[in-house]
Amino acid sequence: MDRARGSAFLLGVLLAGSLFAFSVAKEETKKLGTVIGIDLGTTYSCVGVYKNGHVEIIANDQGNRITPSWVAFTDSERLIGEAAKNQAAVNPERTIFDVKRLIGRKFADKEVQRDMKLVPYKIINKDGKPYIQVKIKDGENKVFSPEEISAMILGKMKDTAEAYLGKKINDAVVTVPAYFNDAQRQATKDAGVIAGLNVARIINEPTAAAIAYGLDKKGGEKNILVFDLGGGTFDVSILTIDNGVFEVLATNGDTHLGGEDFDQRIMEYFIKLIKKKYSKDISKDNRALGKLRREAERAKRALSNQHQVRVEIESLFDGTDFSEPLTRARFEELNNDLFRKTMGPVKKAMEDAGLEKSQIHEIVLVGGSTRIPKVQQLLRDYFDGKEPNKGVNPDEAVAFGAAVQGSILSGEGGDETKDILLLDVAPLTLGIETVGGVMTKLIPRNTVIPTKKSQVFTTYQDQQTTVSIQVFEGERSMTKDCRLLGKFDLNGIAPAPRGTPQIEVTFEVDANGILNVKAEDKGTGKSEKITITNEKGRLSQEEIDRMVREAEEFAEEDKKVKERIDARNQLETYVYNMKNTVGDKDKLADKLEAEEKEKVEEALKEALEWLDDNQSAEKEDYEEKLKEVEAVCNPIVSAVYQRSGGAPGGDADGGVDDDHDEL
């Protein structure tokens, strides 16, 4: 919903989840009925269906087109949607929300540990996974997996669609953040099964939104950036749309950033205020927090349209009524770092897509949090004043796209959708190890799949008859810092001097994201191959994040080293140039008074000694030292020039007339 790659999950888990949707539609048509599209959101969910040549977003039994992703248990029943959310303040420990932040994660994940402290319901560790413990009727304690709670929400969406269509629904396209990893996707599919749904396809939220935007767009190629900031997750995807072909160029995001985090900041602000003003700590009072959470969300929404809102809560604690103003400026200040955090993935996706800002034709806003004026302003500023496109409904676009995808799979979309094709990308660079442990890249990250790349290698020892092919993925230059996917040997190479044999290595990623690697000795025609599949145990989101983060950290370290060397060179250059200037008769030697000369020479001598003693000082130290020396020398040089009628400070930099890097 890290930059280094198109998407955040494992190579080949299809980013759009729908590559070759069109080409496989025919074979799936037989077994699929009407396929609905479900946007299973962190805070709200939405369902749509393609009917009579267009998408219908279906209203629930309360008449609302979006349904809160909330589940609650009372002494007598289970509540889902509005009914659950509306009673949360009086039943906090038994009301479950934000379960999408738990699905497919491990209990030990730092995000889970953080969220545990913020929700009123109980999260426990079961087999290393977070489960929810809740009292159901008759005081019985029951433990639910995140998949089960998600299934309840999916079931509600299924019921909503069935009531509207008047028939049973078995199949659905369900969306996930582009940045969801394999475990999170698989868990979402499992939730579908528990809900009695065949999840015909998992597709990415920004890609689904791109379909909603681009379905009726004809005429010429367009680059669009989908900025999807929802209740709990954030995605950026850059796509090229050309008459029904949706090609993902790059994707990036954060699976733990969204409107819930903004609400939390408002809550923390008021908790502190209440403590200060009333000497009352409500941070452990679940009822008070439930009321405050509801009002924080309401205030946040209101501030998208007005500059000030009053947060009023009857009997918040000890019978005390609470009433405080919240301005838009304060809200923006409370969330400033989080809003700015959204720009990182935008920049990285742009770099990965290889596009200039001017080459983005449209910025499509998706997710309720994109209504926040500050978020829109940051995007506008980044894109040099370009206005985001507000043509799609940010709450409904994802379900809309999922419904279109459903119609392609079922064949019910007819001529209107038959030409739609989604093209996916390989999220991480793929390559092999060559001499010295070097990662030689064959398929760079964000390459559209399916793809095939070949490269010729040779032996590095005389009479070598076997080569070992080791396949890696990752962004680092050495294989020790990348992830080994598999290895195999090519035997029976004809003995020859090193560098003579020609061994062609071919990487092929098919539409399912399965990597085939083949090595062939061009001399003998002998070949070996290995198939690498996308197994569940492969890279987690955290590991991919770590690889890219490390690559970025190393790039940052390299930059710091260069800056330090530049600062040292600058100081040395100044000192030696100044030394020449004051010692050269044609320059200043004869124009300086004895006292001035002594002062300058002493400063230069001291600086050179300092340089000898501080070979590995920090950039700031070198800069500080340069300022010190300049403070002594420059005024004296300026004074000499003024006395001799030259331009004041004419060569006060000690005659530095170039800034070429020294060899």
Swiss-Prot record:
<dbReference type="GO" id="GO:0005524">
    <property type="term" value="F:ATP binding"/>
</dbReference>
<dbReference type="Pfam" id="PF00012">
    <property type="entry name" value="HSP70"/>
</dbReference>
<feature type="region of interest" description="Disordered">
    <location>
        <begin position="641"/>
        <end position="663"/>
    </location>
</feature>
<comment type="function">
    <text>Probably plays a role in facilitating the assembly of multimeric protein complexes inside the ER.</text>
</comment>
<dbReference type="InterPro" id="IPR013126">
    <property type="entry name" value="Hsp_70_fam"/>
</dbReference>
<dbReference type="GO" id="GO:0016887">
    <property type="term" value="F:ATP hydrolysis activity"/>
</dbReference>
<feature type="short sequence motif" description="Prevents secretion from ER">
    <location>
        <begin position="660"/>
        <end position="663"/>
    </location>
</feature>
<dbReference type="GO" id="GO:0140662">
    <property type="term" value="F:ATP-dependent protein folding chaperone"/>
</dbReference>
<keyword id="KW-0067">ATP-binding</keyword>
<protein>
    <recommendedName>
        <fullName>Luminal-binding protein 2</fullName>
    </recommendedName>
</protein>
<dbReference type="GO" id="GO:0031072">
    <property type="term" value="F:heat shock protein binding"/>
</dbReference>
<dbReference type="GO" id="GO:0051085">
    <property type="term" value="P:chaperone cofactor-dependent protein refolding"/>
</dbReference>
<comment type="similarity">
    <text>Belongs to the heat shock protein 70 family.</text>
</comment>
<keyword id="KW-0325">Glycoprotein</keyword>
<keyword id="KW-0732">Signal</keyword>
<dbReference type="InterPro" id="IPR043129">
    <property type="entry name" value="ATPase_NBD"/>
</dbReference>
<dbReference type="GO" id="GO:0016020">
    <property type="term" value="C:membrane"/>
</dbReference>
<dbReference type="GO" id="GO:0005737">
    <property type="term" value="C:cytoplasm"/>
</dbReference>
<dbReference type="GO" id="GO:0005788">
    <property type="term" value="C:endoplasmic reticulum lumen"/>
</dbReference>
<dbReference type="GO" id="GO:0036503">
    <property type="term" value="P:ERAD pathway"/>
</dbReference>
<dbReference type="GO" id="GO:0030968">
    <property type="term" value="P:endoplasmic reticulum unfolded protein response"/>
</dbReference>
<dbReference type="GO" id="GO:0042026">
    <property type="term" value="P:protein refolding"/>
</dbReference>
<dbReference type="GO" id="GO:0044183">
    <property type="term" value="F:protein folding chaperone"/>
</dbReference>
<dbReference type="InterPro" id="IPR018181">
    <property type="entry name" value="Heat_shock_70_CS"/>
</dbReference>
<feature type="signal peptide">
    <location>
        <begin position="1"/>
        <end position="21"/>
    </location>
</feature>
<feature type="glycosylation site" description="N-linked (GlcNAc...) asparagine">
    <location>
        <position position="614"/>
    </location>
</feature>
<keyword id="KW-0256">Endoplasmic reticulum</keyword>
<dbReference type="GO" id="GO:0034663">
    <property type="term" value="C:endoplasmic reticulum chaperone complex"/>
</dbReference>
<dbReference type="InterPro" id="IPR042050">
    <property type="entry name" value="BIP_NBD"/>
</dbReference>
<dbReference type="GO" id="GO:0005634">
    <property type="term" value="C:nucleus"/>
</dbReference>
<dbReference type="InterPro" id="IPR029048">
    <property type="entry name" value="HSP70_C_sf"/>
</dbReference>
<keyword id="KW-0547">Nucleotide-binding</keyword>
<feature type="compositionally biased region" description="Acidic residues">
    <location>
        <begin position="654"/>
        <end position="663"/>
    </location>
</feature>
<dbReference type="InterPro" id="IPR029047">
    <property type="entry name" value="HSP70_peptide-bd_sf"/>
</dbReference>
